């Protein structure tokens, strides 16, 4: 399956095909002429796919170099970005060369950020190997690194030249990482596609979903593609993709990156915001329970111990959706349809101080 993301200044294809990674050299050759290519990956993915990917690229005529960062959210930092700049300079990469992000969401965000800022921008490709990256973060051009203050605080919008998605990589993904991606799939269905919601309802468990991965990934990519085409720079409609993310990011930040995985934070965030939206008449009664039923089926968290209200408040009010003392909150009008509401930041405290906590 091939989907095209059509934007005013730059369009590119999403290739979704089981076994596509085995033909990565041919795919890259169809987009770029032989040149230097740097691969940024993490240590886990490198052990699984690094050598094979380099071999395929070299067979297609590319001169390759590879660097593997530590796996995990801690690598998504300005310090690691600096190391990558130095690596690219040592490899003498120029603006006529290219970079490939091979890995999950952390690698994609980090490598995209580095590509968009090294020499004021070089060409790059996304090759996501986790379910979360395949259905969400590899598409749309958002790149970022974290700081101690907030997740994704420093970043750019930079579109890749292409995205290659091979569902076979899910076979080597640990169950927790599969569930992370499922949280984003549930989010996508909840905000924009009731038919996908019904399809997810028909699946028995995570294994059943992975067995139908190409179909499910394609449906999510269509949602992301359609939203990004209408709002590339996150000024309006694209904000709906952040359903569950404001509180989710805050939970990740206050717990310490990696303690709560991104998908787990999104799962908790979707439940919390929908509980409040129901109380305020913004979402129909029963919407939270529909989410709980779906998320629990895939063994995603729906409750957690109360975190420090003040730390959560500070993290949320540093969220990039906060402007002029107002924060944009995404709520469900119904399953399959989301809307954006603006709230004064001080009202966020009411969200965090509900009886029973998050």
From Swiss-Prot:
Record carries keyword Amino-acid biosynthesis: yes
Q: Which reaction does it catalyse?
A: 7-phospho-2-dehydro-3-deoxy-D-arabino-heptonate = 3-dehydroquinate + phosphate
Where in or outside the cell it occurs: the entry states:
Cytoplasm
Report the EC number(s), separated by commas if there are several. Answer: 4.2.3.4
EC category: lyase
Q: Does the keyword NAD apply?
A: yes
Pfam families, from UniProt?
Answer: DHQ_synthase, DHQS_C
Give the required cofactors. Answer: NAD(+); Co(2+); Zn(2+)
Q: How is the cofactor bound?
A: Binds 1 divalent metal cation per subunit. Can use either Co(2+) or Zn(2+).
- Gene Ontology MF term list: 3-dehydroquinate synthase activity; metal ion binding; nucleotide binding
Keywords of the record, alphabetical order, are: Amino-acid biosynthesis, Aromatic amino acid biosynthesis, Cobalt, Cytoplasm, Lyase, Metal-binding, NAD, Nucleotide-binding, Zinc
Pathway assigned to this chain's UniProt record: Metabolic intermediate biosynthesis; chorismate biosynthesis; chorismate from D-erythrose 4-phosphate and phosphoenolpyruvate: step 2/7
What does the record list as GO biological process? amino acid biosynthetic process; aromatic amino acid family biosynthetic process; chorismate biosynthetic process
Q: Which Gene3D superfamilies match?
A: 3.40.50.1970, Dehydroquinate synthase-like - alpha domain (1.20.1090.10)
* Residues given in the record as Zn(2+) binding sites: 184, 245, 262
Where is it chiefly localized?
cytoplasm
Binding residues for NAD(+), per the UniProt record? 105-109, 129-130, 142, 151, 169-172
Belongs to which family?
Belongs to the sugar phosphate cyclases superfamily. Dehydroquinate synthase family.
Q: What does this protein do?
A: Catalyzes the conversion of 3-deoxy-D-arabino-heptulosonate 7-phosphate (DAHP) to dehydroquinate (DHQ).
**What protein name applies here?**
3-dehydroquinate synthase
From which lineage does this chain's organism come? Answer: Bacteria, Bacillati, Bacillota, Bacilli, Lactobacillales
Q: Which gene encodes it?
A: aroB
């Amino acid at each position: 399956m091939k989907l095209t993301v059509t934007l005013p200044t730059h369009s590119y294809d999403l290739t979704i095909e089981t076994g596509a990674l085995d033909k990565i050299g041919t795919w890259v050759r169809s987009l770029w002429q032989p040149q230097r290519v740097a691969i940024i990956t993490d240590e886990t993915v490198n052990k699984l796919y690094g050598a094979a990917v380099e071999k395929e690229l070299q067979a297609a005529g590319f001169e390759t170099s590879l660097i593997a960062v530590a796996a995990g959210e801690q690598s998504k930092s300005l310090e690691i970005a600096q190391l990558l700049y130095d690596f690219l300079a040592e490899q003498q990469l120029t603006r006529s060369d290219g970079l490939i992000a091979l890995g999950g969401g952390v690698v994609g965000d980090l490598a995209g950020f580095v590509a968009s800022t090294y020499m004021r921008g070089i060409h790059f490709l996304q090759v996501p190997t986790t379910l979360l990256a395949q259905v969400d973060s590899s598409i749309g051009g958002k790149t970022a690194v974290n700081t101690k203050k907030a997740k994704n605080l420093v970043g750019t919008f930079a579109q890749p030249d292409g995205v290659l998605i091979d569902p076979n990589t899910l076979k080597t993904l640990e169950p927790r990482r599969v569930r992370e991606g499922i949280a984003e799939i549930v989010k996508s269905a909840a905000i924009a596609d009731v038919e996908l919601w019904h399809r997810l309802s028909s699946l028995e468990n995570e294994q059943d979903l992975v067995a139908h991965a190409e179909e499910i990934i394609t449906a999510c990519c269509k949602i992301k593609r359609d939203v990004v085409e209408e709002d590339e720079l996150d000024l309006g409609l694209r904000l709906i993709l952040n359903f569950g993310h404001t509180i989710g990011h805050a939970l990740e930040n206050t717990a310490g990156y990696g303690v709560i995985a991104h998908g787990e934070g999104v799962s908790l965030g979707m439940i919390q915001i929908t509980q409040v939206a129901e109380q305020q008449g913004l979402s129909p009664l029963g919407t939270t329970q529909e989410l709980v039923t779906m998320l629990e089926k895939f063994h995603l968290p729906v409750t957690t111990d109360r975190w420090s209200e003040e730390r959560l408040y500070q993290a949320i009010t540093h969220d990039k959706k906060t402007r002029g003392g107002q924060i944009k909150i995404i709520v469900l009008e119904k399953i399959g349809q989301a809307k954006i509401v603006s709230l004064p930041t001080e009202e966020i405290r009411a969200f965090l101080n509900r009886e029973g906590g998050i």
